[in-house]
Amino acid sequence: MPLLTLYLLLFWLSGYSIVTQITGPTTVNGLERGSLTVQCVYRSGWETYLKWWCRGAIWRDCKILVKTSGSEQEVKRDRVSIKDNQKNRTFTVTMEDLMKTDADTYWCGIEKTGNDLGVTVQVTIDPAPVTQEETSSSPTLTGHHLDNRHKLLKLSVLLPLIFTILLLLLVAASLLAWRMMKYQQKAAGMSPEQVLQPLEGDLCYADLTLQLAGTSPQKATTKLSSAQVDQVEVEYVTMASLPKEDISYASLTLGAEDQEPTYCNMGHLSSHLPGRGPEEPTEYSTISRP
């Protein structure tokens, strides 16, 4: 019985020392994506001891997140930092970039031989308020998305139309080229007679020298002079147009001066190709009265 009372007394004294040697806020609130600061105060005599910040509702199972180095230099680990102000006997814990999962029970503690000193701090995280920029960003994104869809719809309509127009132009150009080629082939396939065919209405008139039958060319010249005196009528021959390289001659012979003149229409078309040599024979035609 006296031994049990002694244990209870020691436990009460130990708990009293824990509570009175270090103090801190009971509850601390923070905003999501924000930060919070916790200040813990300790009594004189603990300035050079190590201070720590741990997480967990159970004292023995809490996980130390950050610890001082025994000086006033700030120590940071991940999103948590701690700094000891030994003159004011306070150490400050800062948690940054808060998340909803950071809400839990934490401890402000002092490391010492035997049981450490500590006090609990309840941390709660409130949702961050929705700003006006975030609210207006959704319609902007929606409008931008709709604008992109509208542009894509226009392209889906215009591209087939442009392709169809280009295809029609290509077909039209092909037909035009085919017809021109066919026309050239048809023109190249014309016969020489068609190429050399004279135009209608193109008449050639030639003055023909009249010779009497049975006379030589010299006598014919003399007789022609006398015939001119007697106003002998001159015969005319209508001839079709001939190529320049084809030369035709016509000779007319009269039996007597009192005989009536004879008229003859002569036409000669060359069936030979253009460009024949000058050595080709000359054609002559003689017309006599019966």
From Swiss-Prot:
<dbReference type="InterPro" id="IPR013783">
    <property type="entry name" value="Ig-like_fold"/>
</dbReference>
<keyword id="KW-0325">Glycoprotein</keyword>
<dbReference type="GO" id="GO:0033004">
    <property type="term" value="P:negative regulation of mast cell activation"/>
</dbReference>
<feature type="transmembrane region" description="Helical">
    <location>
        <begin position="157"/>
        <end position="177"/>
    </location>
</feature>
<dbReference type="InterPro" id="IPR036179">
    <property type="entry name" value="Ig-like_dom_sf"/>
</dbReference>
<feature type="domain" description="Ig-like V-type">
    <location>
        <begin position="20"/>
        <end position="126"/>
    </location>
</feature>
<dbReference type="GO" id="GO:0005886">
    <property type="term" value="C:plasma membrane"/>
</dbReference>
<dbReference type="GO" id="GO:2000427">
    <property type="term" value="P:positive regulation of apoptotic cell clearance"/>
</dbReference>
<keyword id="KW-0393">Immunoglobulin domain</keyword>
<keyword id="KW-0472">Membrane</keyword>
<keyword id="KW-0732">Signal</keyword>
<keyword id="KW-0675">Receptor</keyword>
<dbReference type="GO" id="GO:0035772">
    <property type="term" value="P:interleukin-13-mediated signaling pathway"/>
</dbReference>
<feature type="topological domain" description="Extracellular">
    <location>
        <begin position="20"/>
        <end position="156"/>
    </location>
</feature>
<dbReference type="Pfam" id="PF15330">
    <property type="entry name" value="SIT"/>
</dbReference>
<keyword id="KW-1003">Cell membrane</keyword>
<comment type="similarity">
    <text>Belongs to the CD300 family.</text>
</comment>
<comment type="subunit">
    <text>Interacts with PTPN6/SHP-1 in a tyrosine phosphorylation dependent manner. Interacts with IL4R.</text>
</comment>
<dbReference type="GO" id="GO:2000426">
    <property type="term" value="P:negative regulation of apoptotic cell clearance"/>
</dbReference>
<feature type="region of interest" description="Disordered">
    <location>
        <begin position="267"/>
        <end position="290"/>
    </location>
</feature>
<keyword id="KW-0391">Immunity</keyword>
<dbReference type="GO" id="GO:0035666">
    <property type="term" value="P:TRIF-dependent toll-like receptor signaling pathway"/>
</dbReference>
<dbReference type="InterPro" id="IPR050671">
    <property type="entry name" value="CD300_family_receptors"/>
</dbReference>
<protein>
    <recommendedName>
        <fullName>CMRF35-like molecule 1</fullName>
    </recommendedName>
</protein>
<comment type="function">
    <text>Acts as an inhibitory receptor for myeloid cells and mast cells. Positively regulates the phagocytosis of apoptotic cells (efferocytosis) via phosphatidylserine (PS) recognition; recognizes and binds PS as a ligand which is expressed on the surface of apoptotic cells. Plays an important role in the maintenance of immune homeostasis, by promoting macrophage-mediated efferocytosis and by inhibiting dendritic cell-mediated efferocytosis. Negatively regulates Fc epsilon receptor-dependent mast cell activation and allergic responses via binding to ceramide and sphingomyelin which act as ligands.</text>
</comment>
<keyword id="KW-1133">Transmembrane helix</keyword>
<dbReference type="GO" id="GO:0034125">
    <property type="term" value="P:negative regulation of MyD88-dependent toll-like receptor signaling pathway"/>
</dbReference>
<dbReference type="GO" id="GO:0005136">
    <property type="term" value="F:interleukin-4 receptor binding"/>
</dbReference>
<feature type="disulfide bond">
    <location>
        <begin position="40"/>
        <end position="108"/>
    </location>
</feature>
<feature type="glycosylation site" description="N-linked (GlcNAc...) asparagine">
    <location>
        <position position="88"/>
    </location>
</feature>
<dbReference type="GO" id="GO:0002757">
    <property type="term" value="P:immune response-activating signaling pathway"/>
</dbReference>
<dbReference type="Pfam" id="PF07686">
    <property type="entry name" value="V-set"/>
</dbReference>
<dbReference type="InterPro" id="IPR007110">
    <property type="entry name" value="Ig-like_dom"/>
</dbReference>
<dbReference type="InterPro" id="IPR003599">
    <property type="entry name" value="Ig_sub"/>
</dbReference>
<dbReference type="GO" id="GO:1902216">
    <property type="term" value="P:positive regulation of interleukin-4-mediated signaling pathway"/>
</dbReference>
<dbReference type="GO" id="GO:0004888">
    <property type="term" value="F:transmembrane signaling receptor activity"/>
</dbReference>
<dbReference type="GO" id="GO:0042802">
    <property type="term" value="F:identical protein binding"/>
</dbReference>
<keyword id="KW-0812">Transmembrane</keyword>
<dbReference type="GO" id="GO:0097001">
    <property type="term" value="F:ceramide binding"/>
</dbReference>
<dbReference type="InterPro" id="IPR013106">
    <property type="entry name" value="Ig_V-set"/>
</dbReference>
<keyword id="KW-0446">Lipid-binding</keyword>
<feature type="disulfide bond">
    <location>
        <begin position="54"/>
        <end position="62"/>
    </location>
</feature>
